A protein has these predicted regions:
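A glycine-centered loop/beta-turn motif at secondary-structure junctions
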Residues: 160, 167-168, 175-195
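Pocket-forming structural segment of enzyme catalytic cores
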Residues: 96-175
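Extreme N-terminal starter segment of soluble prokaryotic enzymes
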Residues: 6-12
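An anion/phosphate-binding loop that grips the pyrophosphate of nucleotide cofactors and donors
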Residues: 47
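Conserved beta-strand elements of the Class I
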Residues: 12-14, 149
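Cysteine-nucleophile active-site neighborhood
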Residues: 55-128
Length: 196
């Protein structure tokens, strides 16, 4: 287990063995955030914000998250209305399950649905791509016409969550590579992006 002292007002990156935590930390620091890495559930729960990164196979990311009780920390944060951001496979594991190479792995189940392989002639989808964001998206405010960097072969390709008043509808942002897929979801305190 690892834990770097949480600086007051900071963001914790859940450290469960994912390969891109240092690049994520650097990006957040360049944006002015105070960043700490931790595999401790209590530290992840107490942070101002929690980042769930993810690189590699859905099953490996879930095994890593489960090994540090990350799912419980995420659930506790969301129950309390505290922000969580999932990136790449960190977004994918927020769905009910993922199917990769015939293996069906349970996810965290924050959203219904399955992550499957893109129906595209060239995989992985690697490079810059545009997105189709809602006009009132907070995440894409002022940058909706920009291009975003993707590296993936799997994604959530449909949205099945039905939300009824008085609850707000999640903001869904889509992209396309062979087939249409979710590029980002803004859902109360839970936000996730497929791009890096």
């Amino acid at each position: 287990r690892s834990s770097v002292a949480l600086k007051e007002g900071g963001i914790v990156i859940l450290d469960y063995g994912s390969g891109n935590i240092h690049s994520a930390a650097k990006a957040l620091e360049l944006a002015g955030a105070r960043v700490s890495l931790s595999s401790e559930k209590s530290v992840a729960e107490a942070a101002d914000g929690l980042l769930v990164p993810g690189v590699g196979a859905f099953s490996a990311v879930m095994a890593g998250i489960n090994s540090v009780r990350g799912g419980a920390a995420i659930e506790k944060r969301l129950t309390g209305g505290r922000p969580v951001l999932g990136i790449c496979v960190g977004m994918q594991v927020l769905f009910e399950h993922g199917v990769e190479r015939g293996n069906d792995t349970p996810g965290l189940g924050e959203w219904p649905g399955v992550v499957t392989q893109l129906d595209a002639p060239i995989l992985p989808h690697m490079g810059w791509n545009t997105v189709d964001a809602p006009a009132d998206s907070r995440l894409f405010s002022g940058i909706a016409d920009e291009r975003f960097y993707f590296v993936h072969s799997y994604a959530a390709q449909e949205w099945t969550l039905e939300v009824h008043d008085p609850f707000p509808q999640p903001q869904l942002t889509w992209a396309e590579h062979g087939s249409r897929f979710l590029a980002a979801v803004e859902n109360g305190p839970l936000t996730a992006t497929q791009f890096h």
